[in-house]
Amino acid sequence: MTVQEQIDEYIVGQPEPKRSEMQELHRVILEIMPGCKLWFLDGKDGEGKTVSNPSIGYGLRTINYADGTTREFYQIGLSGNKTGISVYILGIEDKKYLAETYGKDLGKASVTRYCVRFKTLKDINIDILEAAIRNGRKGKSEPGAIATGFLSR
């Protein structure tokens, strides 16, 4: 099964309205990051034990560890969870930046150092989420321009 087929199967397996909202977010992220590398992580470790929610990844970044080793991983992630949807924005160095820059304007969402978690798209300001994703794509802790929204409410 290709990565795109795994992604499609994962999204289709979500209950509504999460399914439609994840399809829309998937489309939007691909518009923001055309031609990016796609990932699908099934949430299982090497022994097949579930250790996290499955996630869709977009883009490519290299993680540098203190011991000198490196690992390739995605820049932006999308995952369904028990209470809604999580968007992961990785690579921003300042751990407070995402919450301080976008948290108060996002709406009804929980924002941590790299994750925006919300119940439904109706609860958040879509333009602000898009700006955070665009900024995360750059991998920098600097304000990104808020572009016109790709998402419809």
What is the role of each PLM region?
Residues 1-153:
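Charge-dense, helix-prone N-terminal extensions
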